[in-house]
Amino acid sequence: MSAPETTAPLQPPAAPAASLPGSLAESLASSGITELLAQLDRELIGLKPVKARIRDIAALLLVDKLRAARGFSAGAPSLHMCFTGNPGTGKTTVAMRMAQILHQLGYVRRGHLVAVTRDDLVGQYIGHTAPKTKEILKKAMGGVLFIDEAYYLYRPENERDYGQEAIEILLQVMENNRDDLVVILAGYKDRMDRFFESNPGMSSRVAHHVDFPDYQLDELRQIADLMLSEMQYRFDDESRAVFADYLARRMTQPHFANARSVRNALDRARLRHASRLLDDAGTVVDDHTLTTITASDLLASRVFSKAAPDARTPAKE
């Protein structure tokens, strides 16, 4: 009986030692990804699962570069994504940072973000949709195409709707140019689920699904502080407590949009702050006066004219 055949361990092609990266830490430092991830962490409060997924994708691309330097290759991964969540949860901001990370790691050439909706892709008459969609894809090539409320591309109730034509063009480009374009579809989770059920071709091309949770009360307070700091304003102790009360009330009302609603509330507070200073124009202003949002700037909101909920205990992380 002949001896069993043995398989030699996989040996990578030889490469000059000087050309190979050293440790993962060294490769991470030289890639510039650490600062981009840190910037994302500074910009976005909370969202730990989202940040973890972005880090995983960055790690995959970084390790792929190390493998390629040693002669290993599994082919470029498909990185088309779906971001689901309510408005104001950071989907567009994460898409922007994702584009920069992909560029930094050499996955895309330019690293820019092109954000569109159905109206940018779908025409209003025969022969109009294909040129519109192709023009957007041309602009996005080498970067990331972010399609907000992507489910509006598909309208099964209207047989003459041109959205399906845009979808077919997108599918072709997502398959043939996946090494130079990342498409991110975004919207409410339940509607995106129905969209994928009705469009299996699109579902099969989207490998990464990232859910953006709503912010909790404490996170929204931190977001408000961050936004005010960026605008060079501040709360005093009283207005900080009033704004927390404002958020607790506003979160229970219709059309609450997380960080977007926080920004809108702060913008209105700035208007009232400026109006208050103008009404008291004889007073000499100083840095404190010009930068401090007071309780009166917030209490004028119509949110306080409606009854607050009897009890509300925001979920904790």
UniProtKB/Swiss-Prot annotation:
GO molecular function: ATP binding; ATP hydrolysis activity
Keyword ATP-binding appears in the UniProt entry: yes
Residues covered by region (Disordered): 1-21
Pfam families assigned: AAA (PF00004), AAA_lid_6 (PF17866)
Function, as annotated: Seems to be necessary for the expression of RuBisCO.
Family indicated by similarity: Belongs to the CbxX/CfxQ family.
Name of the featured protein: Protein CbxX, chromosomal
